[in-house]
Amino acid sequence: MSCTKLFVLIFCVLQTVLAGEKPKAHLGGALRFNYNYSDWKEGNKHRGGDFGFDVFRINVNASWKKIRLDAEYRFYARTSGGGMLKYGWVGYQFNDNHVLQLGQNTVPFGAMPFNSNNYFFSINYYLGLEDDADMGLKYCFRKKGWELDAAFYKNADLLDFSEGVETSDSRYAYDIAGRNKEVNQGNLRVAYNWGERWKHQIGASAMYGGIYNLDTEKMGSRYAFAIHYTLNWKRWNLKAQYTTYKFSPENKEDEPRNQITMTAYGAPYEIAAHADTYTASLCYTFPIDKGILDEIRLYNDFSMMHKRKAGFNDSFQNITGCMLGMGPVLVYVDYALGKNQPWLGNDWNEAFTSATLEKGWNARLNVNIGYYF
């Protein structure tokens, strides 16, 4: 869908909403720029890093009676995938406890809304298991500390309905790509919150779905399970999560089944088809309220990927950084360390599979500056 068609669609929906009784609508967004200094890129180091455009996004939130609309569209550089819908759904809010969402909505899995604090997210994001949105129907229940989300997703965000077409690389979150496609996915997430001073949450998530191969026209399968725990105490926040997943594609006989293609931001790569991940995040917020600086949030986010295939080397990621809050301006300063992580090293296609090229850790200093409105 082109940007022009998307804006026309959003305009028409808003016009419909505004024609009703006492509608509510809000238009927001953000403009972000990014600086990075990567120690594995010789040219980047000689230049003292690079600074440029990151993303411009538009958010639309509207309601009429019990009908809700929530959407976010992002504009990246063409080399990073160009324009893409992050999420967009129409829903019905029965009351404060029950909501239905239809469309491209956020997949309920693990600690939410994020399993991390930094610009890079956790390693789960790069496997399609954090901050992902797919096309389907989701039911949300909230009452007396309980959270229940049940969803069915027909497929990942689909941009071309033609038969036999591979999944587009222009997407925000990672989905299965290449000659395989995500289909008929079910998700269930249950979490319980308790405590007043020490605010705890413990939860479990499950996902099961199909993998349709365009060549063999056979249906494979995939699953993922996770347990998570979060704690908020005063200005401290802790997140911890264990995740296991397995993809079983029905590829052609001459193609490997111990790895699978994933894609986002216009650049696909391979990941291990069977792995466990471990994540742990800790942050502390300092209230400042002086001048333009409201707060400083310090954090360290660690995650690792243990690959079940013999001979596949594990992947690691550790992000130490801070977020500076200045009214509508947020600045993330991150020192990212990665080992066998495609975004943090020279090995793009095999870092999440065999990972035989990288021998040590790589580092990236990243500063992201955004104005949110």
Task: Please tell me what each predicted stretch does.
Residues E21-G29, K65-I67, D96-H98, K144-L148, ...:
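Outer-envelope beta-barrel architecture signal
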Residues K22-S38, R47-L159, A191-G195, V333:
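Outer membrane beta-barrel
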Residues P23, R47-F56, G82-K86, D131-M135, ...:
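Residues that define the transmembrane beta-barrel architecture of outer-membrane proteins
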Residues G29-Y35, A71-F75, L102-Q104, A150-K154, ...:
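Transmembrane beta-barrel strands of outer-membrane/channel proteins
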Residues N34-E42, R74-T79, F109-A111, S116, ...:
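Sequence/structural signature of outer-membrane beta-barrel proteins
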Residues N44, L159-A177, L214, S248-Y269, ...:
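Solvent-exposed loop segments that connect transmembrane elements
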Residues Y192-R308, F316, Y371:
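Detector for outer-membrane/organellar transmembrane beta-barrel domains
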Residues A280-L282, V329, K359-F373:
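Outer-membrane beta-barrel "beta-signal"
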